[in-house]
Amino acid sequence: MPVITLPDGSQRHYDHAVSPMDVALDIGPGLAKACIAGRVNGELVDACDLIENDAQLSIITAKDEDGLEIIRHSCAHLLGHAIKQLWPHTKMAIGPVIDNGFYYDVDLDRTLTQEDVEALEKRMHELAEKNYDVIKKKVSWHEARETFANRGESYKVSILDENIAHDDKPGLYFHEEYVDMCRGPHVPNMRFCHHFKLMKTAGAYWRGDSNNKMLQRIYGTAWADKKALNAYLQRLEEAAKRDHRKIGKQLDLYHMQEEAPGMVFWHNDGWTIFRELEVFVRSKLKEYQYQEVKGPFMMDRVLWEKTGHWDNYKDAMFTTSSENREYCIKPMNCPGHVQIFNQGLKSYRDLPLRMAEFGSCHRNEPSGSLHGLMRVRGFTQDDAHIFCTEEQIRDEVNGCIRLVYDMYSTFGFEKIVVKLSTRPEKRIGSDEMWDRAEADLAVALEENNIPFEYQLGEGAFYGPKIEFTLYDCLDRAWQCGTVQLDFSLPSRLSASYVGEDNERKVPVMIHRAILGSMERFIGILTEEFAGFFPTWLAPVQVVIMNITDSQSDYVNELTQKLSNAGIRVKADLRNEKIGFKIREHTLRRVPYMLVCGDKEVESGKVAVRTRRGKDLGSMDVNEVIEKLQQEIRSRSLKQLEE
């Protein structure tokens, strides 16, 4: 009979099979009330599942990440329960958990309106407030199929026929008269599912195949308590205000149009930000001793066949033909960099060779996935490739890590999650080579005092990698930086150098990206700063305004002076009230507004205001220039007097 070992090491002995709920009740009524599920020997199980042998058990509650995921999954079933009550002829497809919530794909003979969604959410709340028990039943494949066939649930029947073995025992979960099928686990009672909201609807093809029927996907979010739900909804509200597409239009940074899906039309102010970002990256490339190169944006298909990209990536590549030759527009820069490396004989003394490029890349992303600057078809990669010996890997990875943190800190990103992906089952190279490579990456992270977690088996077949995910002010994750070792591509493309022993050797290649895509990173920055770009990045850094025509000459003189000092400045001499001008440039997020009246002309000074509405008073023009130059030069995130 089972001996149950709890997380604190204590044990409980039973003379019969017990469930996680039984053990929770044995510990105390409070834990039993909070029990959502159990983790038995590392595997999640329902609170009612029986444990027949000795096992390690953790009780899962709403405070656990697993508990929250189970709540969300059960809310998907709750949605199914409600929609079948409102529209009984609905056919249910799939209802998985996603980040922050869940969705359900349904086949319904009407297009859901906003009023329908509100009615559906209301019915879900009515059902959840009944606090009914969720009953689990393990049945044979044949019984499960008969159950759903009798209910007309053709999509569930299809899942059983195509995805579940005949000797398997599917789990059926009964919500009163409604039944759903799932691996589970699910909540034991609907009292855990009170804090949710339906968010939106969208179209989705059955099984993601455009040849199949279009279903309606209903998205929802769910949380353990009301406070967490409200906090999430507030974050969404703030995110909507910061949407880079909205701000990009307000600030006239760029636009997209139907004739070039996923391609960016940069306007003057947006392109100014892009070029300033390039200047910043170039300054770091120089500091960290990189060469900058430029490769062609398309190359013969034969080369992409050699690299393996054609076999594994051709659906995402644009192609064109000329004179009976097929060319691929590059989706990445690495093959071109190997071609540059291959020009001329290389010695071990030439290594490491660090090669960077602002490469114009194109990928044929599905039209439905395109999203402003965040997901495009044409983009600029800030990546680099380092050619080195095996002995140099650790030092080079160290340099990459320092560069990543150096650049991210400039923008104020402090929360960065790091993951190290290790060897997959299918891979090239010896175990000894992988041992050394993985150890080099781990030691480099440890030497920089960077906590990280392993992603076992998640590396590419050609080498392990480090991923850097930064979190913005709304705690959203953005995976931007990577350091990837490559033992394959140099060999495929015949790259070599002469070693100390005068023998030809294949270099190790390190793929390194920090911002990832320049376009996407500008989108991230736009939302991070809500359009209030730090002064060094702002398209227009200063606007100088007159109050009446009598100050026009003074304004023009100052405008020229600031421009000569390297400051991006504009004069506003319009015949408008000064309050109107200030409001307009404040909405344009211009960092500084200099106001000139008769008093300023007489004294040779300017009245300084910030876009946040702070009045810095009257200041000497040379003092303003000096302070602005210092703020811009240091790439400060703060404005004067902050």
UniProtKB/Swiss-Prot annotation:
Binds 1 zinc ion per subunit. Keywords: Acetylation, Aminoacyl-tRNA synthetase, ATP-binding, Cytoplasm, Ligase, Metal-binding, Nucleotide-binding, Protein biosynthesis, RNA-binding, tRNA-binding, Zinc. InterPro entries: aa-tRNA-synt_IIb, aa-tRNA-synth_II, aa-tRNA-synth_II/BPL/LPL, Anticodon-bd, Anticodon-bd_dom_sf, Beta-grasp_dom_sf, TGS, TGS-like. Transmembrane segments: none annotated. It is found in: Cytoplasm. The modification N6-acetyllysine is found at residue 286. Homodimer. Catalyzes the attachment of threonine to tRNA(Thr) in a two-step reaction: L-threonine is first activated by ATP to form Thr-AMP and then transferred to the acceptor end of tRNA(Thr). Also edits incorrectly charged L-seryl-tRNA(Thr). This is Threonine--tRNA ligase.
